[in-house]
């Protein structure tokens, strides 16, 4: 939906540096399946950060806010595809690892918030995308059959979670996901962007 994965490539290290600390691992990989709150706990336990979980989450969000407000864009073809889905009576919602206020604001700025009945965030659900809870909550909101409810994901681990739970899946290319071959192999459909004509056949 949003071309925003680039933000999370280095934010873990950048936040530590803002506190005068250096990471001793690839935090992108470490944090891949964690919620922001879980990542904050990790900072506290493994890097001796004395701030509260809320203070850490607020600090990370403050660092990404400006990027979301100015640089994050829609993935190619998504605006037209959402309009087509809406015209054809397809219900849609969002399931995201990003905090609600950032997603709400960005979708409004990009003119697509009205397409979605609801936004579900990992923070509010209480589980990351390594668990299927967020997809199950979204399914409940949509009121559709699981077999007819497609999960679009550009992260391999998240798509694997949805597929393992029985959802049909669409893998979406993202240059920041290094496991493209695995994503393509695992997904029921795989697209480079949202201009792919196969989307109107699903």
Positions of predicted regions on the chain:
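Structural motif
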Residues: 30, 95-97, 152
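Short phosphate-binding/catalytic loops that engage adenosine nucleotides
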Residues: 88-90, 167
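Asp-based, Mg2+/Mn2+-dependent phosphohydrolase catalytic module
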Residues: 83, 99-100, 104-202
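Non-catalytic, surface-exposed connector residues within folded enzymatic/regulatory domains
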Residues: 54, 72-75, 97, 110, ...
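N-terminal helical cap/lid subdomain that shapes the substrate entry/recognition surface
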Residues: 1-88, 101
